[in-house]
Amino acid sequence: MYTLHTKRVKAAAREMWTSNVSKVRQSFKNVYHKCKIRHQDSTRYPTVTSDDCNQDDVSYDGKMNLTVVLQDVKTAQVELFSQMTDIVHAIPKVHEKTDLYQKQMEVLETRMNVNEDKQGTTTKDILSMKEDIKALKKKVTELEKQNSYSRIHCLEIPEGERGEEITELLYKLIQPATLKNTLASTDREMSSAEPEKVPSYPKSTDHLEKITISPQIKTLKKRNHQNASRNFKIAKPNIYIYPDFSTWIKLTFVHGGKWTFFLSATKLEEFIQWLLSRPTILPEEPQVITQRYCPFTGLILSLTTICLSMFNNIYGFIRSLKEEVTRL
């Protein structure tokens, strides 16, 4: 812009100079032609010199023309001088502006270089972050595989008729096991109670032994039943929804000791109806199985959140740098 401005000023000065010089030359040419014509007239007609008045008039007219020409030349020179002074005064201002703009351009170049360096560092950081994220993903997949190959036994219930068949099989398998557990517990309590409370009688009194033992067995059975009902009321079945199995639900029930399995969310209503329809068999010692906690889940979640936050910060920083560059 400033180079064009200086070029325009120079061109205007040249045009003014050439126009004024051409005017001066034209005025000199006119005077020269007039003088030449008069000189030719005087040489052609030398006899016509009778009137001195005419000669005086011619000389006066020539002097007048010369004075007018000189005045025109002076005015043109004054105009040229004023215009040249204006140009001379404008040139340092133009130089100052060009210096200022050159400094601003240098500052912008330095900023652009700094921004390019920052962009290079940010790209390197992003690439390193991508590599770290890939490594974390690999670790997460390895941990998921380790968790999948753990000792948890999952019982999958498919859709349709197979689900009903599997529930019936479970009912058949669980019911005899619960009955065996209850009978074994009652037998153990009876055997433990007999040597303590029953006195030793001779072999001939078998009928009396039966009579004396039967009320004790009845009281033990009643106590066992009451304790089992209390424990059953305290230890209710728990339902755990695991984050690793998004569509599977782990059910832990107290019926017949320890037994747990995983059930699909779509088959949960059918399973609840089956549980309500089956007879209630109270166990001897109910046990509530707590949820297994994986120690790597919290660490993985924290690492992923940190990586995502760092990636968002770097992306925001790059966007701000781009906005600054576009503004500049």
UniProtKB/Swiss-Prot annotation:
Disordered, as annotated region: 186-205
Top-level taxon of the source organism: Eukaryota
Modified-residue entries (Phosphothreonine), positions: 182
Keywords assigned by UniProt, alphabetized: Coiled coil, Phosphoprotein
Coiled-coil blocks: 122-151
Signal sequence annotation: none
Residue stretches of biased makeup (Basic and acidic residues): 186-197
Protein name, UniProt field: Coiled-coil domain-containing protein 54
